[in-house]
Amino acid sequence: HEMAATLTAVRGAWPERRVVVAFQPHRYTRTRDCLELFADVLSSVDEVVLAEVYPAGEAPIEGADSEHLADAVAERTGRRPTVSTLEDLPAAIARTARAGDVVVTMGAGSIGRIPAKLTGRNE
């Protein structure tokens, strides 16, 4: 799975640092189909912040949203990730991350705009 491979590489590059993942699930159908896999992978990092699902034109599906994904991560780790709107995601990351942490953003939707907001760049 590409998420697991990416996070393994991050851990290998910075083994002594905490890893914080900000993840925006893409599509409700994919979130439904991959919820357990996503929860397993996200449970391997130190902290998780979730954005709401990027719907890509799909209607919501009961049980296939970021709140349910947060519950699944909490079942595995005992810590429930923060679920945030995309607009509030930079602030949620700032509240979660510490100096020296590696922050990784993942997702196929509008989360691509977040790294520039975190670094103060307007790109």
Give residue spans per PLM region.
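ATP-dependent carboxylate-amine ligase
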Residues: 1-123
